[in-house]
């Protein structure tokens, strides 16, 4: 699917959808990440040229009677908007691909294992490798499955579902897998320089996704992912709070910072063409 445009008025957006339907073009409306707009998405990319031509006319005269007439032709000008925002389990599962759900469930299983077997027992199998364990390759990523409190795991898994889900849905399972592996290794290495192997959590991967999804949304919104700027600001605030230990929390600051850096760098690389195109306009 291709993102066509973001519109602040949902009713006008629906009128354009109805009008394009008279041309046998199906558009889908979705809420934007900032909550202030709705986005129109095209399912058949072979019709993109036609949509762009019609959209140019629509933006010049959105109140033209032909768009209202199309809504009447569709059946009812007052029909409900065609996007869904109900937060139920079916909706939540639809927003997450197989890798997102698998990692989410693995984290829950490992957390329950830690409650029954104890932190030390589980860490002896999954923690970041010490000097004699570097060939136990799973340890380079499984430290991300370790969580030491209910708040810790809930916070990380909410972010993982929100960011990992949209990344997997729009960019594919392979892209999410690469981001996860690279950021787990890089953030784990960064944290190990300060605390050895005594740490755990998905936070490094989460911060990598925050950086990746935010910058991709800013530079290439047509790719369908993004983080509202308010949430990005909150994430940076939390990063600063960790460094100053404002609430007396034990936070893996190096993992957060390392993850954010690697996520931003990966987004810069994946969206490098957008920077080149923008530079040509100066």
From Swiss-Prot:
Q: Where in the cell is it found?
A: Cell inner membrane
Annotated GO molecular function terms are: serine-type endopeptidase activity
Q: Which UniProt keywords apply?
A: Cell inner membrane, Cell membrane, Hydrolase, Membrane, Protease, Serine protease, Transmembrane, Transmembrane helix
Q: How does it sit in the membrane?
A: Multi-pass membrane protein
Q: What class of enzyme is it?
A: hydrolase
Q: Which GO terms describe its biological process?
A: proteolysis
Q: What is the reaction catalyzed?
A: Cleaves type-1 transmembrane domains using a catalytic dyad composed of serine and histidine that are contributed by different transmembrane domains
One GO CC annotation:
plasma membrane
Pfam families given for it?
Answer: Rhomboid, Rhomboid_N
Q: Report the active site residues.
A: 203 (nucleophile), 256
Which SUPFAM superfamilies does this UniProt record tie to the protein? Rhomboid-like
Q: HAMAP family given for it?
A: Rhomboid_GlpG (MF_01594)
Q: Which family does it belong to?
A: Belongs to the peptidase S54 family.
What is the official name of this protein in its record?
Answer: Rhomboid protease GlpG
Could you tell me which species this protein originates from?
Answer: Photorhabdus laumondii subsp. laumondii (strain DSM 15139 / CIP 105565 / TT01)
Q: Tell me the organism's taxonomic lineage.
A: Bacteria, Pseudomonadati, Pseudomonadota, Gammaproteobacteria, Enterobacterales
Which gene name belongs to this protein?
A: glpG
